[in-house]
Swiss-Prot record:
Note, other: Kojibiose does not support bacterial growth of K12 / BW25113 nor of BL-21(DE3), perhaps because it is not transported into E.coli.
Keywords, alphabetical: Carbohydrate metabolism, Glycosyltransferase, Transferase
Source organism: Escherichia coli (strain K12)
Annotated catalytic residues: E473 (proton donor)
Gene knockout outcome: No visible phenotype when grown on glucose.
Record-stated family: Belongs to the glycosyl hydrolase 65 family.
Lineage top rank: taxon: Bacteria
InterPro entries (alphabetical): 6-hairpin_glycosidase_sf, 6hp_glycosidase-like_sf, Gal_mutarotase_sf_dom, Glyco_hydro_65_C, Glyco_hydro_65_M, Glyco_hydro_65_N, Glyco_hydro_65_N_sf, Malt_Pase/Glycosyl_Hdrlase
Name of the protein this chain belongs to: Kojibiose phosphorylase
Reaction(s) catalysed by this chain's protein: kojibiose + phosphate = beta-D-glucose 1-phosphate + D-glucose
Residues noted as binding substrate in the record, renumbered to the chain: W333, D334, K573, Q574
EC number: 2.4.1.230
């Protein structure tokens, strides 16, 4: 395996402080650390977050991911002048292979003296609570007096909202300090322990004032002499209170002391080895194209790891991962649809954990359904740790009218329920995990199916699904949204299949499910192949969207039109019917997929970061490789592009997952259809070769393909469909793609053969 690449920050700019703090964030799924600088800047947002640690700041506030006390900040004073701002030379990079962030700066003070300041840090991959930092200072041309102040700064807030009360701060011996904090509702405790080790002849003292516990280290350096400070941090949190606070804090301190017996480099080596093993089983390599393409793939996989709480099935992946406070750290449908597939095909145990998060929160979903007059489980549109609905009731206030508009998503964007069921079936078909599907999976499928059965309304002699919002959030409160109806039917059908297969004794459910499937009316494909998005969409006027599409992601349409006006036009925020074609490819012919893509894409602004990748995958399945690659590239630039504020409040986690989706499900053509693994590869002309690992039903596959051939190596014999034809691979096989001609652009092969 070649080594993953690095991400470099080309130059220092205060305009991109928070963008790169997100892009270069570090973590391990347990905690996330923004790549803020050691020195302070007014516009800089520091951030450190623990997966699952949410708190509500007060009445009327929403549960949000808690921004912890800062441990990165360091005030560096050289000859009394505080280090900040201007730099003579600059280099900062994040090494995806090891997760280490490195910075080298040459700084000159006001009197012209020069200093090299080098810092590096990592969040441990093998000891989840551990962060290690190192900074070195070297005078270049004159002696210097150096003072470094660093420790635990508990003045950090979530944009002014304080979640933690300081319980206790202590200093132990000459090198150890600890701060203990409790959420203001008294339910969770956080212990942050620090150890600072400094080389050379130094003087040290401590201060504790205004929620800051700091160690101050001073040294006199000659020109060319280097001062090195290594800082280790151990962060524990709990919400069970099984041990006394002092006992629990002491245990945390002992863990730090054990780490302190090793150097920074020794700790880094262990973490890097953990990363190496992880990359070995997951890295995607591409030959050809621009260097950006490989970097984007490495970037995506790196962040997919650090955002995922693989250690804790009571937590899931937030819309911004653990890189910022956007969306308050809440979990959306993004997790099941855009993020879970990566884990499903690389480490199914993680996918199982993410689904068990939903299973643990079934009671809250059942209660939400009950409160709204339905049966089964209605999962919250936004969730945190408890499983309760966390979507704000109102959006931002209109400063001209003084009115707030209700947030409609939690009221009607119910497709999330079927999305979770879809993910359960994807997991079941990919792994064959009977213990899961017979217990947690069955519960999720039955309860979500019961919701749809009760959610449908009778119109004459048929059932319909009314007052919903599909993935296109610019079209609200419509009847018979195609995505919602098709996914609801799929949900109920799969629940019925599993109930029968595993001997469910609920005869009443089976009868109701059968009647639902028989009577549910489904939006019908028109003679031109287009599936209407809902009952009213086709009757609405279309407008020229060119200027809005040019500013995709900015929602500039809402500067010219109200939401109510947008709702009455053929304007899509993101893929809707095209999203359905992606989710259930076996149910649609290639001709229909192509017709939908050609009809809906010109009407789609792509104001959601979720949109372009899905269009790209469907375009690839339709053989439109130039368009598909363009969508994929534009999707990679949602965060990595030139916009200086593209991800100030955290990366777009789903768009990051979609980079993997586009390469594997788009260009490699990987999909699961009716319980079978399909590969329908079609590389863009920019790529000469694509190689990737894949997990399927207990087998580890390595797939390498180019324009003419596909090589598959497997750990055990496996059957799959290559361009629709069933093949069996044992050990390693090479196939000429010319021998596997794919009918009409590669979608719904079985259906086309039937037709």
């Amino acid at each position: 395996m070649t080594r993953p690449v690095t991400l470099s920050e080309p130059h220092f700019s205060q305009h991109t402080l928070n963008k790169y703090a997100s892009l270069m964030a570090q973590g391990n799924g347990y905690l996330g650390l923004r790549a803020s600088h050691e020195e302070d800047y007014t516009r800089q947002t520091r951030g450190m977050y623990l997966a699952g640690l949410y708190h509500r700041a007060g009445k009327g506030e929403i549960n949000e991911l808690v921004n912890l006390p800062d441990v990165v900040g360091m005030e560096i004073a050289i000859n009394g002048e505080v280090f900040s701002l201007s730099h003579e030379a600059w280099q900062r990079e994040l090494d995806f292979a090891s997760g280490e962030l490195r910075r080298n700066v040459v700084w000159r003070t006001s009197n012209g003296s020069g200093y090299t300041i080098a810092s590096r840090r990592f969040v441990s991959a093998d000891q989840l609570p551990l962060i290690a930092l190192e900074i070195t200072i070297t005078p270049l041309d004159a002696d210097a007096s150096v003072l470094i102040s660093t420790g635990i700064d508990a003045t950090q807030t979530n944009h002014g909202r304080q979640h933690l009360d300081e319980t206790q701060v202590r200093v132990f011996g000459q090198h150890l300090m600890q701060g203990s904090y409790t959420t203001q509702d008294g339910r969770s405790d956080v212990a942050i322990s620090c150890c600072c080790k400094v080389s050379g002849d130094v003087q040290q003292c401590y201060t504790a004032k205004e929620r800051r516990l700091l160690q101050h280290t001073s040294a006199q350096l000659h020109a060319g002499e280097t001062m090195t400070l290594q800082k280790l941090v151990w962060i524990d949190w709990r919400d069970d209170r099984q041990a006394a606070l002092d006992e629990w804090g002491s245990a945390s301190l002992r863990q730090l002391e054990m780490c302190a017996q090793q150097s920074y480099d020794q700790l880094l080596a262990a973490s890097t080895e953990n990363w190496r093993q992880w990359w070995q089983k997951r890295r995607i390599t591409v030959n050809g194209g621009e260097a950006h393409d490989q970097q984007a793939l490495d970037y995506a996989l790196y962040h997919l790891r650090i955002m995922t709480p693989a250690h804790d099935e009571r937590s899931s992946i937030a819309a911004k991962g653990l890189t910022g406070e956007g969306y308050k750290g809440h979990v959306f449908w993004d997790t099941e649809v855009f993020l879970l597939p990566f884990h499903l095909f690389s480490d199914p145990t993680v996918a199982r954990s993410l689904l068990r998060y939903r299973w643990h929160n079934l009671p809250g979903a059942q209660e939400k359904a009950r409160r709204n007059g339905w049966q089964g489980a209605l999962f919250p549109w936004e969730s945190a740790r408890s499983g309760e609905e966390e979507t704000p009731e109102f959006a931002a206030i209109n400063i001209r009218t003084g009115l707030r508009q209700k947030v409609a998503s939690a009221q009607a964007e119910h497709h999330l329920v079927a999305d979770i069921a879809w993910a359960v079936i994807q997991y079941w078909q990919t792994t064959g995990d009977e213990s899961f599907i017979a217990h947690e999976g069955m519960a999720l499928l039955l309860e979500t199916a019961k919701f749809w059965i009760s959610r449908a309304v009778r119109v004459n002699d048929r059932l319909e699904i009314h007052d919903v919002i599909g993935p296109d959030e610019y079209t609200e409160h419509v009847n018979n949204n195609a995505y919602t109806s098709y996914m609801a039917r799929y949900n109920v059908q799969q629940a019925l299949n599993i109930a029968r297969q595993f001997g469910c004794s609920d005869d009443a459910f089976i009868h109701r499910a059968e009647m639902f499937l028989k009577e549910l009316w489904m939006p019908e494909i028109q003679p031109d192949g287009v599936l209407p998005q809902d009952d009213s969409f086709m009757a609405k006027p279309a407008i020229n969207l060119a200027k809005y599409k040019a500013a995709a992601g900015k929602q500039t349409i809402l500067l010219d039109y109200s939401r109510a006006e947008v709702n009455e036009m053929q304007i899509l925020k993101q893929a809707d019917v095209v999203m359905l074609n992606y989710m259930l490819p076996e149910q649609f012919s290639a001709a229909s997929c192509l017709a939908n893509l050609q009809f809906y894409e010109p009407r789609t602004i792509h104001d959601s970061s979720l949109s372009k990748a899905i269009h790209g995958i469907v375009a690839a399945r339709c053989g439109l490789l130039t368009q598909s690659y363009q969508f994929w590239r534009e999707g990679t630039e949602i965060d990595l592009g030139a916009d200086p504020h593209s991800c100030d409040d955290g990366i777009h986690a789903a768009a990051t997952g979609a980079i993997w989706l586009g390469a594997i499900q788009g260009f490699a053509g990987v999909s699961v259809r009716d319980g079978e693994l399909h590969l329908n590869p079609a590389l863009p002309e920019q790529w000469q070769q694509l190689s990737f690992p894949l997990f399927w039903q207990g087998c580890e596959l390595q797939v390498t393909l180019d324009a003419q051939r596909i090589a598959i190596r497997t750990s055990a014999p496996v059957s799959l469909r290559l361009n629709g034809q069933l093949i069996t691979v044992a050990e390693e096989s090479v196939f000429c793609l010319g021998d596997f001609i794919l009918p009409f652009n590669g979608t719904a092969t079985k259906h086309q053969e039937d037709e």
